[in-house]
Amino acid sequence: MATAATEEPFPFHGLLPKKETGAASFLCRYPEYDGRGVLIAVLDTGVDPGAPGMQVTTDGKPKIVDIIDTTGSGDVNTATEVEPKDGEIVGLSGRVLKIPASWTNPSGKYHIGIKNGYDFYPKALKERIQKERKEKIWDPVHRVALAEACRKQEEFDVANNGSSQANKLIKEELQSQVELLNSFEKKYSDPGPVYDCLVWHDGEVWRACIDSNEDGDLSKSTVLRNYKEAQEYGSFGTAEMLNYSVNIYDDGNLLSIVTSGGAHGTHVASIAAGHFPEEPERNGVAPGAQILSIKIGDTRLSTMETGTGLIRAMIEVINHKCDLVNYSYGEATHWPNSGRICEVINEAVWKHNIIYVSSAGNNGPCLSTVGCPGGTTSSVIGVGAYVSPDMMVAEYSLREKLPANQYTWSSRGPSADGALGVSISAPGGAIASVPNWTLRGTQLMNGTSMSSPNACGGIALILSGLKANNIDYTVHSVRRALENTAVKADNIEVFAQGHGIIQVDKAYDYLVQNTSFANKLGFTVTVGNNRGIYLRDPVQVAAPSDHGVGIEPVFPENTENSEKISLQLHLALTSNSSWVQCPSHLELMNQCRHINIRVDPRGLREGLHYTEVCGYDIASPNAGPLFRVPITAVIAAKVNESSHYDLAFTDVHFKPGQIRRHFIEVPEGATWAEVTVCSCSSEVSAKFVLHAVQLVKQRAYRSHEFYKFCSLPEKGTLTEAFPVLGGKAIEFCIARWWASLSDVNIDYTISFHGIVCTAPQLNIHASEGINRFDVQSSLKYEDLAPCITLKNWVQTLRPVSAKTKPLGSRDVLPNNRQLYEMVLTYNFHQPKSGEVTPSCPLLCELLYESEFDSQLWIIFDQNKRQMGSGDAYPHQYSLKLEKGDYTIRLQIRHEQISDLERLKDLPFIVSHRLSNTLSLDIHENHSFALLGKKKSSNLTLPPKYNQPFFVTSLPDDKIPKGAGPGCYLAGSLTLSKTELGKKADVIPVHYYLIPPPTKTKNGSKDKEKDSEKEKDLKEEFTEALRDLKIQWMTKLDSSDIYNELKETYPNYLPLYVARLHQLDAEKERMKRLNEIVDAANAVISHIDQTALAVYIAMKTDPRPDAATIKNDMDKQKSTLVDALCRKGCALADHLLHTQAQDGAISTDAEGKEEEGESPLDSLAETFWETTKWTDLFDNKVLTFAYKHALVNKMYGRGLKFATKLVEEKPTKENWKNCIQLMKLLGWTHCASFTENWLPIMYPPDYCVF
């Protein structure tokens, strides 16, 4: 057998399938129609120009004509202009950049910017580089530093047993070094490479250079022009292998660094048009076609598509006069064939004759799971994913060939408005090229993302032949050829494969033979606001129904009016189903004609039924239908009380890839269903997909969807639960995984349960005290254990500013239609470290269907550092924030300024995850709730029985810090006692907050008034005048006022405190250090330290005015510590200044004070005195402790205090102090990483959208 296997030729044809679609036979017939002359726009994650097969076409042209990033994720603000001095400029990173003499720059001006590599590195590359940098750059050096620090500590401990103050500090120093190194290891965070960017005009074109080596020597970096000008690209290094190109906009003020955001786009392009001159068996479907790479997957959003990216992409597609678009992206949409993005796509297709091919989606096997735009937009050809036996052997290495099938996950039609959804199918898997940064040449990927470029490449072959023979075509004629010649697989349902598997050769022949004007037309089919007839819910199929259907011709752009006038089509209408009646003929001219179709589903058996009313031109009936009216009817099974609302299926046989659909009328009052699957096989484990979908008008299928991929062991059992809506049909689909081998038998049961709450969402206002809700067990006996859990507090924000302006050159639609942006700014405070989820309620969950071009928010800290971003789907963009103040900038784009101005006061919300969940008390009657007595526990409700419950308000001390009026707590109510019921039947809860109660402060002002003697007006005036003079003393910098007050009030402590603060805050503070020391001594001398120490030692103060005394003593202690620290800082600054000048601290007589004590001794005395009263890590003491360590050259202790200062006040200056100490300690690796963080943490401005 081994010999036979080695002699059998390798199935290369199955790696990137072409036989199944007729592409291989087409190329055998017409080898020169291999895509030449065809330009395919690949809208994806970007294409790597250095990837295998992405260099040239079969006729020697550049494979990629241009590479564009339309998302903005690679944009660099280069508006800052500088001129070199002595051939050097200082980049925004702080590095000195050496300008090569060979560069030509007539103006002498350079635009500079900065970009963190991790901002545009693909996620997988970023993770790999982070791991490699830690292993190669950090770990070896850090291990040596840590070992050395531990060794020094051990040696000191062995050699020194004494506990003198000096030894104590040295021991603390060595211990600090070890602790810091351990801490740095735990907190290790790689900032990644930070690149300086330069842009300049050489007199002819704009050029850019990125300091990819991060060393400032630009002679070693690549100078690039816009990619389209010379197909130039660079690489970020042999470790990264990340290729990049550039585009320069806005007169050099904006640089776009274009990289691939993932491997997906290159793989897609390779399937469609990869070319390997030396290995033709690896070619894509259309190796002669050229590629326009457009990155629409935003790296900031994990390569999620955005409205900005898509609309800019369509502008580029039109400007480059592309023939085809491949779009292997898509999302579920709330309403099909609508929205701003879809409008722009329609314009490109209808007005510019651009064929738009897209993936149908990977959300099967249930019906109506097609994505947008592939399966929901009339102008787009949606492609399903098919797998052939050859693919199973070559790509997936299956032990045996299975019959051809649709992949289990391939999305199915119809769309929610009745359109078929899937147009055609193509092979949905391939082993093809991927970007170099993956360190792989090829990779297996599957999905409708792969079927779409396979079909797109096939269409490129057709267009190549048509162009070579000067045969006119339209998007309508090409689509009709594809659909009318596709081959239907008998074992695959129409909603999965659409019209069938694309046949390139037959479609080409069709277009050559059918060149009539009628064939070039499109036809819009409307059924009210829908595009087909889709009867799904029980009420829709209970009786016959009549449907008015509009048929209207769509002419290609620039059609002559005379041709429109002469249009006269004689159409025959046919239907092959007895349950549909339609007219036999229709005369169609240049207007919308209406016909009536009657659908009578009463005699249909349970299950799914599909048919079409087709319109044929009687002049050429063999050309196939000019249009189709899709009709779908679902007859749902009923469950009732006699079966306990259960459906059971026993010993059901499943072949590999087999799907069984069950349409069930959900009983009124049902709120969740449970499905139990049991394997009957004792030999075979089986992989199944359990999928359920209910459709609700203007809600995407995902809103009421359950999906579970499960592996069922031999004789194993699985139970799952999911929510349902009563009174509507549900599709429950159980599918054997497409690649499973061997047959298997299973039993499965679907059981419905219902606990109905009076409100679909529970809204509780704290001011009401007690809130009531009622519950009913609708179907059967149910065990209840009601529980309300609150997990988030939600903060509502209003914008502090809203600015509207026109966008740049990339944002102009055809006919000079300028796009505009509104940027709204919001501020909020994060009271403590935690997870937040920002969102814009008005626009969230809307992408393709939104009436606005796009939405994108970016959150910044108070230093303008970007912390995170998000767009239409907020649940995908939660992030962790530390305590502090933050700014959110929200960009909304549209063509009309007036529509943007309506949003100038748009609210925005930030949902904060609670560190500990909160619960509300629930009672079974009002009196228990009112008195806070017995809480509700478990109870059993009989069918149709109603039970009220009463919820009490949350105690005020449980309200999270920062939450207040205008905020609410969000959580859920579960009613069932069972775990499955708790998981499936969940009711949202909003708890609205009110102002907190007013709290009285400790100590009463009335008591103070009673205990004090009434002051006469003269005494009050004297004190007020004194305090006024003290206030002005600090402003006027006058010693005269101070001396005058000191004579009058020699024992008034606030006077001396004010003088100390005045001197310590002066601009020329360094010149008055001795005065600061004297002022601090004056403050200290006026505090009775003995009395203060005695008071602090007291455990309890029984005196009636204890609160007042405590307040006074706390102030005295705070003042004492403050004075000691200011004195210590002044002494330390004096010594550090002396050290900087002389290189050492003088301890001789010249440096002594009049009393005979040296500044160093005075500093030590002050330090140890301070430690008596407070901890060195107290916020007020940190600066003194830090400077004391510096004076004593104990850089470990200094760094420990400096890092604490950074935590309390993360300024750039504090970070620089840390870096300096790291260098003094010899920890250059720590210093280097920290230095790289600085331009990231403290950018010059907000990053661009």
Curated annotation (Swiss-Prot):
Protein's UniProt keywords contain Phosphoprotein: yes
GO molecular function terms listed in the Swiss-Prot or TrEMBL record: aminopeptidase activity; endopeptidase activity; identical protein binding; serine-type endopeptidase activity; tripeptidyl-peptidase activity
Entry-annotated residues carrying N-acetylalanine: 2
Region span, Disordered: 998-1018
Modified residues (Phosphoserine): 915
Record-annotated Peptidase S8 domain positions: 9-508
Active site positions, chain numbering: 44, 264, 449
Record InterPro entries: Peptidase_S8/S53_dom, Peptidase_S8/S53_dom_sf, Peptidase_S8_His-AS, Peptidase_S8_Ser-AS, Peptidase_S8_subtilisin-like, Peptidase_S8_subtilisin-rel, TPP_II_domain, TPPII_C_art
Modified residues (N6-acetyllysine): 401
Alphabetic keyword roster: Acetylation, Aminopeptidase, Cytoplasm, Disease variant, Hydrolase, Nucleus, Phosphoprotein, Protease, Serine protease
Pfam family, one: TPPII
Gene Ontology BP annotations: intracellular amino acid homeostasis; protein polyubiquitination; proteolysis
UniProt-annotated location(s): Cytoplasm; Nucleus
Enzyme Commission number: 3.4.14.10
PROSITE patterns: SUBTILASE, SUBTILASE_HIS, SUBTILASE_SER
Ranges of biased composition (kind: Basic and acidic residues): 1003-1018
Family assignment from sequence similarity: Belongs to the peptidase S8 family.
Disease the record associates with this protein: Immunodeficiency 78 with autoimmunity and developmental delay: An autosomal recessive disorder characterized by immune dysregulation, increased susceptibility to bacterial, viral and fungal infections, recurrent sinopulmonary or skin infections, and autoimmune abnormalities including hemolytic anemia and autoimmune cytopenias. Patients also have global developmental delay with speech delay and variable intellectual disability. Disease onset is in infancy or early childhood.
Leftover remarks: The limitation of proteolytic products to tripeptides is achieved by tailoring the size of the substrate-binding cleft: the two negatively charged residues Glu-305 and Glu-331 that are blocking position P4 limit the number of residues that can be accommodated in the binding cleft and thus create a molecular ruler. At the same time, they orient substrates so that the tripeptides are removed exclusively from the N-terminus.
Protein name according to UniProt: Tripeptidyl-peptidase 2
Organism field: Homo sapiens
Protein's gene: TPP2
